[in-house]
Amino acid sequence: MDIHLSHTTTKFTGRINITGSKSESNRLLLLQAIYPNLRLVNVSNSDDTQTIINALKSSKSIVDVHHAGTAMRFLTAYYAFKLESVVILTGSKRMLERPIKILV
């Protein structure tokens, strides 16, 4: 699937069918958080995807991603983009040992 997004003032509509994979779902959930009019169906029911859904719905200042590495990396970028938010991402003991310095 190739999608190119660029800034526009024109409203557009369309439909993208996804496989429901964890990888596609996680990426599209973050796009939906930025573009709230994006409607998603057939989202993965994986633990990692549920972790991202819960984090994006949370109003807490500390978000626990447990052992979801993709969630940690994607949410790091997302919360860095949201300058009005101060969120601390944490996770399992093993997650906190994994490298992320290059992203921050």
Regions inferred by a protein language model and the residue ranges of each:
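Structural preference for solvent-exposed beta-strand-turn elements
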Residues: M1-V104
